């Protein structure tokens, strides 16, 4: 983990201050829910975000979130699902109460994630735990182990959002945390998104600058949508084989450090997974040892008291090992995987930034080519058929001769179209440059936020893991000291 602690990005002048943009609308809040969970799960620590300190662009507002108590609902039907208790403590003014408690299912978290990703494209929105898991294939996605691990992951998702200077002020996040009528919010936002996508589909073709002129006839919504999808696919396919001409060294270093972080996390994950398997084996061995000593009581009734006490102590140790294994596997091991996924979200943001720069460079190259072509036409190069004309100009000239076109008039018409194209391209280049520069600044701030959130999360996870080990060994010492005292009282152990 030494490589992780060295990710300080000291050679990049990043600013962690961020203006708190966006206002949140007030929402109605009903009574708090208090369902009884069906699983005996170790409660995740609710004060995960209490490590926030002032001076990091977060403001004075407190936002602490916790996810716990998975509950299987509609049991016995095909529509069964698991809901999670989401509790929030906050000092935000737009919350109706400082403490809120609601139940949300995983699809609610998915809707929140997609909405945040759509509304904040320049932010590295923390990812959700992967839904494509073997538990869905084996059918044990309602098991205690799976739901507990998911509760920890969902808690980390909300904690990251609460630590983000922009996402923590999002209106949709606040609604998610306290609204008693969340389903109505999802329906209204879904219908609004569909209507907005329908109205903007006809304009998407004009937003993408192409070499040809705009068509005069109008097309239907379905054709416009199909053309837009095809254009986006074509752009993605072409840009996959296009590299940035002037890569920014700052973001190259960020990607290299992210790759190193992923490598370190993968290595630590393997080690922790091996430790978890050893703890499972030790738990099974202790249980087996306790069972064998229970059988010994039948063979040696004279030592029933000491043997029974010893077997009970071994059984208590096995229970402690089980709690330690659950803390290691469900919380800490899951946090490593979640952090690797969060690093992937940052890499996706770097790819989006690179795409903005690539758009600017391609538009600039297209503008330069159009300007050079205009200069050649203005000097009469194509019309004279000289060396400047080239093969294309020569062929065009011959075709115009066959068609009986006036060369001078054709040259002036092409020159006029080039002037219009250059004028449009100049505006687009300036716009793309400004967009790329602004996106660069946002990504720099996002990297700084990612580093801060990562440090807080790792500190909390290390502290939680150390505390679970301390609790286990304290409990084990108490168990065996109690056993020794009992044996001393019975005279089975020499004082």
From Swiss-Prot:
Domain PX, first and last residues per copy: 62-184
Chain segments carrying region Disordered: 20-51, 193-219
Principal localisation: cytoplasm
Database matches in PROSITE patterns: PX
Keywords per UniProt: Autophagy, Coiled coil, Cytoplasm, Endosome, Lipid droplet, Lipid-binding, Membrane, Mitochondrion, Protein transport, Transport
Subcellular location per the Swiss-Prot or TrEMBL entry: Cytoplasm, Cytosol; Preautophagosomal structure membrane; Endosome membrane; Mitochondrion membrane
Membrane topology term: Peripheral membrane protein
Keyword Transmembrane helix: no
Biased composition (Gly residues): 208-219
Presence of the UniProt keyword Nucleotide-binding in the record: no
Disruption phenotype: Decreases vegetative colony growth, invasive hyphae formation during infection, and virulence on rice.
InterPro entries in alphabetical order: AH/BAR_dom_sf, PX_dom, PX_dom_sf
Binding site for a 1,2-diacyl-sn-glycero-3-phospho-(1D-myo-inositol-3-phosphate): 105, 107, 131, 150
Listed GO MF terms: phosphatidylinositol binding
Superkingdom in the source lineage: Eukaryota
Gene Ontology annotations for the cellular component aspect, listed alphabetically: cytosol; early endosome; endosome membrane; lipid droplet; mitochondrial membrane; phagophore assembly site membrane
Low complexity composition-biased segments: 20-31, 193-207
Free-text function comment from the UniProt entry: Sorting nexin, involved in the separation or division of vacuoles throughout the entire life cycle of the cells. Involved in retrieval of late-Golgi SNAREs from post-Golgi endosomes to the trans-Golgi network, for cytoplasm to vacuole transport (Cvt), and autophagy of large cargos including mitophagy, pexophagy and glycophagy. Required for invasion of the rice sheath.
Domain notes: The PX domain binds phosphatidylinositol 3-phosphate which is necessary for peripheral membrane localization to the perivacuolar punctate structures.
Protein's name in the database: Sorting nexin-4
Species of the source: Pyricularia oryzae (strain 70-15 / ATCC MYA-4617 / FGSC 8958)
């Amino acid at each position: 983990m030494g490589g992780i602690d060295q990710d300080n990005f000291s050679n990049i002048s990043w600013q962690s201050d961020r203006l708190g943009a966006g206002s949140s609308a007030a929402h109605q809040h009903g009574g708090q829910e208090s369902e009884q969970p069906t699983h005996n799960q170790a409660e995740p620590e609710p004060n995960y975000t209490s490590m926030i300190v002032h001076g990091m662009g977060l403001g004075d507002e407190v936002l602490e979130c916790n996810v716990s108590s998975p509950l299987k609902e509609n049991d016995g039907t095909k529509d069964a699902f698991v809901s999670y208790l989401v509790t929030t403590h906050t000092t935000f003014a737009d919350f109706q109460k400082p403490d809120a408690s609601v139940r949300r299912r995983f699809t609610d978290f998915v809707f929140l994630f997609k909405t945040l990703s759509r509304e904040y494209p320049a932010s590295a929105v923390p990812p959700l735990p992967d839904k494509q898991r073997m538990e869905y294939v084996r059918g044990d996605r309602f098991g205690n182990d799976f739901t507990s691990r998911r509760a920890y992951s969902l808690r980390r998702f909300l904690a990251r959002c609460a630590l983000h200077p922009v996402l923590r002020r999002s209106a949709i996040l606040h609604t998610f945390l306290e609204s008693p009528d969340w389903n109505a919010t999802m329906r209204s936002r879904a219908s609004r998104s569909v209507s907005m996508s329908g109205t903007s589909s006809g304009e998407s073709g004009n937003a993408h600058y192409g070499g040809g002129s705009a068509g005069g006839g109008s097309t239907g919504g379905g054709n416009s949508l199909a053309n837009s999808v095809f254009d986006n696919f074509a752009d993605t396919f072409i840009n996959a084989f296009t590299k940035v001409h002037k890569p920014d060294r700052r973001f190259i270093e960020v990607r290299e450090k992210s790759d190193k972080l992923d490598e370190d996390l993968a290595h630590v994950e393997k080690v922790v997974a091996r430790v978890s398997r050893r703890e499972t084996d030790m738990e099974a061995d202790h249980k087996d040892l306790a069972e064998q000593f229970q059988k010994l009581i039948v063979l040696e009734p004279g030592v029933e008291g000491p043997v029974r006490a010893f077997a009970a102590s071994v059984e208590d140790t096995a229970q402690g090992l089980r709690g330690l294994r659950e803390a290691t596997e469900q919380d800490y091991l899951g946090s490593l995987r979640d952090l690797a996924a969060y690093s992937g979200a940052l890499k996706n943001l770097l790819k989006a930034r690179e795409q903005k720069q690539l758009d600017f460079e391609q538009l600039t190259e297209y503008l330069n080519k159009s300007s050079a072509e205009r200069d050649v036409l203005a000097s009469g190069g194509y019309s004279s058929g000289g060396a400047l004309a080239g093969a294309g100009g020569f062929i065009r000239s011959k075709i115009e001769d066959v068609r009986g076109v006036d060369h001078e008039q054709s040259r002036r018409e092409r020159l006029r179209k080039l002037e219009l194209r250059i004028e449009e391209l100049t505006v687009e280049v300036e716009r793309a440059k400004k967009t790329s520069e602004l996106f660069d600044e946002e990504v720099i701030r996002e990297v700084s936020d990612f580093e801060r959130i990562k440090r807080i999360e790792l500190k909390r996870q290390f502290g939680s893991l150390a505390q679970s080990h301390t609790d286990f060994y304290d409990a084990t010492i108490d168990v065996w000291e109690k056993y020794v005292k009992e044996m001393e009282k019975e005279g089975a152990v020499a004082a």
